[in-house]
Amino acid sequence: MAAARAAKTGPLVSPGQVPLLYLDANVLLPEYLRAVILDLADAELVRVHWGEQVLAEVQRNLLKPKFGMTPASVDKLLRDMRNAFPDALLLGSEALEPEFEGKTDPKDAHVAAGALKLSRRYGGQPVLLVTGNIRHLPELAFRDTLVQPVRPGAVLKDLLAMQPAVADVLDAMLQRFEHPAVSREDLLAILDASNCRAFATALGNAWGLASSGD
């Protein structure tokens, strides 16, 4: 299992690597963080995957009043995600959930199992389980596997360091937002407030700006 242990040291992204990401629902709920990750996937700088339970959780939460979305708009978002990334949906991970009994929060066992299934599906490739809740999906739960739970800001920062094109992709992304318009400075402030401060700083530097956290 030396390879598994080695995968959890050093940078999260290697030069020339297209990281394999399994996304927890909580990183798909914030509009702009979701846009950042999915635009990078569309540019083939990362590969994204999720499970049916993850999408169900996204749907359930986006219908809460604080997100200001209608059932129709949520359905369209999920339909667009499925259409844009037809290979992202991972099925058949339920049998792996018992492996995480007592290791993760019971409600997040399906996320852990999905990430492990993804690693095995790709012949033991490292998988970054991108989550905003490391406490419920601790690294210890994935000992002797090639799955590493990481916060979104950490993987985005390392990806930018290895792939300067990240800055160009996100610059182009901003052109889609019109009502309201979102400037570079706006996005940096949003990322900073979304626990992605180090990434916001690095992205601001790439754009020749300073993030709001500096």
PLM feature spans:
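Hydrophobic "anchor" residues on beta-strands that sit immediately upstream
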Residues: L20, L128-L129
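Alpha-helix/helix-capping structural signal
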Residues: N26-V27, Q53, R135, A154
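PIN-domain endoribonuclease scaffold, especially VapC-family toxins
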Residues: E52-S93, A172-A210
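Acidic, metal-associated active-site segment
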Residues: D105-Q125
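Short linear capping/connector segments at secondary-structure termini
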Residues: S93-E99
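Metal-dependent nucleic-acid phosphoesterase active-site entry motif
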Residues: M1-A35
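PIN/NYN-family metal-dependent endoribonuclease catalytic core
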Residues: L20, E31-L33, I37-F67
